[in-house]
Amino acid sequence: MGSLLALLALLLLWGAVAEGPAKKVLTLEGDLVLGGLFPVHQKGGPAEDCGPVNEHRGIQRLEAMLFALDRINRDPHLLPGVRLGAHILDSCSKDTHALEQALDFVRASLSRGADGSRHICPDGSYATHGDAPTAITGVIGGSYSDVSIQVANLLRLFQIPQISYASTSAKLSDKSRYDYFARTVPPDFFQAKAMAEILRFFNWTYVSTVASEGDYGETGIEAFELEARARNICVATSEKVGRAMSRAAFEGVVRALLQKPSARVAVLFTRSEDARELLAASQRLNASFTWVASDGWGALESVVAGSEGAAEGAITIELASYPISDFASYFQSLDPWNNSRNPWFREFWEQRFRCSFRQRDCAAHSLRAVPFEQESKIMFVVNAVYAMAHALHNMHRALCPNTTRLCDAMRPVNGRRLYKDFVLNVKFDAPFRPADTHNEVRFDRFGDGIGRYNIFTYLRAGSGRYRYQKVGYWAEGLTLDTSLIPWASPSAGPLPASRCSEPCLQNEVKSVQPGEVCCWLCIPCQPYEYRLDEFTCADCGLGYWPNASLTGCFELPQEYIRWGDAWAVGPVTIACLGALATLFVLGVFVRHNATPVVKASGRELCYILLGGVFLCYCMTFIFIAKPSTAVCTLRRLGLGTAFSVCYSALLTKTNRIARIFGGAREGAQRPRFISPASQVAICLALISGQLLIVVAWLVVEAPGTGKETAPERREVVTLRCNHRDASMLGSLAYNVLLIALCTLYAFKTRKCPENFNEAKFIGFTMYTTCIIWLAFLPIFYVTSSDYRVQTTTMCVSVSLSGSVVLGCLFAPKLHIILFQPQKNVVSHRAPTSRFGSAAARASSSLGQGSGSQFVPTVCNGREVVDSTTSSL
C-alpha cells in the first residue's frame, strides 16, 4: 500500500513537472543508459532555483563523466559490443530541485512493475508511453550529501543503483534506508576522525564548530563531536550557516565565535560557498582564527579568493586523489563548437571568458590560454563511472556468456541483482592512475569507498603569494610534517593555543566541573603526594616520598645520627674525656687504695660509684650508635642502670651518715648495717630494683626499631627505637625516687661536723643533679620532634650527671691524694671543742642505754676514724 501511495505521488509530481518550462538535459544514446546528476549551477536566490554556472564542481565533473564514457566505449575489453549512453541532469546544488530533476530517471520504470515487468493493459497489450522515456540502468551522483539522500530515497523505490562521487554523509552508510546507494568516497566519520586527530596532535582541546545546514554539515559535525569527545576535546560553541543567509548573518556567526576567546580554533564542516562567505565575514571584521576545515573547503582557490588574510594558517582536508592528465588535455581541448553535446557549455564559456555569443566575441578564447586547475574529485567521478561499467561487464558475462550483445536477461537490467551481486563486489585498479601509485577501486559492505585524505595548510609563500601546501595525510592514522607549517615549525615559537584552561604544573591535578572535561582548576598536590592520574593526588604513605616526575614513590632513606655528624662529635668528645677522667680517678684510687682518704671514703661504694659514672659516659656511645634491637635493649637497660648505680651508692652513703649521727645525738647504740659488706648489699639491692623494672619493661614492650615520621616533616624518616618517650622517662622514675631520697639525706646531714663534710659534697652533687634533671626533662619533651636535638640533649645530660658526681665527690679527694699527700696520713688528736660536748653527751647517753659505747674520734681534723668508721 505504501509503495502504491508513493507511486501515485510521483505520478502527480511528474505531471506537474511535465507542465513546467523546458529543462536542459544532456542525452547520449546507448544500449545501456547511465543517469548523471551534477551541480552544474550554484544555488540560486530565494526566488530562483539556479545561480551562476559552477565551473569546477559542475562543468568539470560533468565532463569527467563524459570523458570516462568515451574511454569505456572505446575499450575493447570493457563491455565489448555494448555502448553506454548518458542522461545527465543539473541539480543546481539544491536537494529539492535535484529531486524534481531525478524524476526523469524513473519515468521508464513507471511503465514497468517493481520487478521489472511491463504493465499489462486490460486487453492484454503492454502499456506504452507517448514519449518513450529512456530506461536508466544506474545513476552517477549526486554531489552534495543532501542531494544524494533525496535522490536515493527515490531511486530505491525503483531498484535503480546509484554511485556517488562526492557525497560523504555518514547517513548514507545505513543500508536499511539507502540499500541501492554506493560511493567511491569514504563517509564523513573518517574525515571527522582525521580532523579530531589533527586537533589532538596540536593539543587543541577547546574549539568552536561551524556546520552547514543539511546532511553534509550536520551529520559531519555530529561525527566530529563524537570523535572529539573520545579524545577529551570540548566544543565551546556550535554555529550553523544556512542556505540563504545574508552577509550580516555570516558576520553574526563570526561574532558568536569571538565570544569564546579561548577557542582560537574553529572547525568547519561546511559547503564551499558557506566557507567562502564565512571567510569574507572574518576578513571584514578583522577576526583571526585557526581554521580546520573539511573537504567542503578542501584546496579550492575559489573559497579563499579575496579573503586570503583571513584564511592564512588554515588546515584543510581533502580526499586523497591524483590529477588525471588525460582529462586535463581533454578538457582544455573543449570549446562550444566541438562540445555541442553539453547544453551548458556555452553558458559556462560566456561566464568563464566574460563574453557573449550574441556579440560573437567568444570565438577568440581558448581554455588552453588560461590557467587550469583540475577539480579534486575528478578522479572519483571517473572511478564511479568505471565502477558501474565493471559491474555491468561482470553481470553481462554472467547472464549473457555467449554473446557480446545484450541478451534478454539484461532487457531490462535487474537493478537489485546489479547492485547486490555486482556493484558491491566490484574490484579493479583505478584507471589513469600514475605509474608509481596503487589505487584500487572497491566498496566495503556498506557501499563506501576506502578512506584516505590529504592534509593542506594555506600559507603565504616567500613571493608574497598565497597557496595551499600539502603537509600530510590520513589513512587510518595521522601523518604530519610540521616543518612545512609556518606556525608549527620549530623556529616559529610556541604553537597557537586553543584551550579552556592552561595545563596544570607537574605537581598539580585538575579539578573539573561536572560535564566540563576541558575546563578545570589546578589544585597542587601535597609535598608527600604523587599524581595517581591527572585528576587525583595519592598519598605515598609514611616512609615514602614522590619521585621527581611525581609518577610514583620511593622509600625514603632512614635518618639517624652518624658518628661524623656535628650532633655526635660534641657528646662523644665529652663522653670520651669523662670516661678517661673516670678511669684516671679509678687508677688513682686503686693505687692509693690503703691510704686514709680512700679508706675513709668508703672504698667499696666509691668503686661502685665510679662504675656508675663510667656507665653514664658509655651511654653516649650507645645512644649515638645506629638503632638496632641490641642497641635499643642496651639503651633501656643501660640508662636506668647507670643512674641507679650512681644514686644507689650515694643514697647508701648519705643514709649511713644520717644514721650514724642521728644515733650519736640520741646516744643510741652503734647503727646496724653500716659495715662495708652491708653497704654493698644495700647498694646492690637498690640497683636490683631498677633492673627488675627494666626487665619487666623489656618483657611488656619488646625492644626493636621503627620508622618515625613527624606529620609536619614527612620527608624525614627517622630510624628510632620503638619505645615511647613516656616509657623511657617512666623507667627513670625509680631513679628520681633515689635522687629525691639522696637529696633529702644530704640536706639532713648538712650540719654534720666538719670531719664529716663529705655530706656537704654529696649535697652539692644532689642539688646540681636536680637542676640538671629539671632542665633535662622539659628539653627532652620539647625536642621530641627532632631526634638529633633530643639524642644530643640526652647524651649531654647523662654525661653531666656523671661529671657532677666525678667533680663534686672525687675531685676534693683527688686533690688531697695528689697535691696534699701530707694530709693523707693517720694522726690522732684530741676532740675539738666544737665536737667534744656532743661526743660527751652521745657517750653519756650511749652508756646509759647500751652495753657498748660508740664514741667517734677525729683523724686529720677532717674524717672520723675508729673501728666502726674506718671505711667511710
Swiss-Prot record:
Keywords: Cell membrane, Cell projection, Disulfide bond, G-protein coupled receptor, Glycoprotein, Membrane, Receptor, Signal, Synapse, Transducer, Transmembrane, Transmembrane helix. It is found in: Cell membrane; Synapse; Cell projection, Dendrite. GO terms for molecular function: calcium channel regulator activity; G protein-coupled receptor activity; glutamate receptor activity; group II metabotropic glutamate receptor activity; scaffold protein binding. Residues 1-18 form the signal peptide. The chain crosses the membrane at residues 568-590, 605-625, 637-655, 680-700, 726-747, 761-783, 794-819. The keyword Ion transport does not apply. L-glutamate binds at R57, R61, S145, A166, T168, D295, K377. Belongs to the G-protein coupled receptor 3 family. PANTHER family: METABOTROPIC GLUTAMATE RECEPTOR. Forms heterodimers with GRM3 or GRM4. Interacts with TAMALIN. Interacts with HTR2A. This is Metabotropic glutamate receptor 2. It comes from Homo sapiens. The gene is GRM2.
